[in-house]
Amino acid sequence: MEQPSAAMLVIGDELLSGRTHDANMHYLAKELTEIGINLTEARFIRDDPAAIVSNIIELSKRFDYLFTSGGIGPTHDDITTDCVAEAFEKKASIRSDALKILQEYYDGKDIELNEARRRMARIPETAELIDNPISAAPGYVIENVCVMAGVPKIFQSMLKTVIPKLEKGLPTLSLSVKIYKGEGDIALDLEEMVKTFDQLNFGSYPFSEKGVHGTNIVIRGTDKKLMEEAEDKVRSLT
């Protein structure tokens, strides 16, 4: 069974300037791994319409799923929806279903639903809304693209509603073996193991603990029995 693939497009000048720290990619990777979807690529781009459109077109064609974060708020630099609409040749406008959600939310807080906030009801035609239990303004899914907020708490809450609807693969398993040898000492043997167990992924990570040096070998895959065979081979390197 081939694992579904995914990419992530993280949008926002504030991330690339260092003003804001991204937490969404790490969270997405962890959640997708648990349901057998491989997050294969992630890109960080500025609030540049041409770049956003071209990346959406490319990544949505190459991967089973594309997740975006950022750029769907009420301000002038929240341009993701227009870019998504352009990428799929759809019209973006204020949708009555999205507007109703916002109206009820702001009425409940006795806050005016002004023109800026109404912008968050602009959704491409044919898109399916993603629930936002924290601040109401919805994300949406259009074809294989999930468009979500950049604020981590909201991104996470949106993802929880999206995940049950995704086509899942086999859960990716992971195990770690600690070898008290340097990477240079085991590199050739490890290379042969990678060839032998070509259905698995191997990672090599040096460590230093209280003056003792070594290498952590991380094995990832979906076949538990095969992983255990590989683990035995790796342990023989000690």
Residue ranges and their predicted role:
Residues 44-47, 97, 118, 181:
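Short beta->alpha linker loops
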Residues 144-237:
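An accessory alpha-helical subdomain
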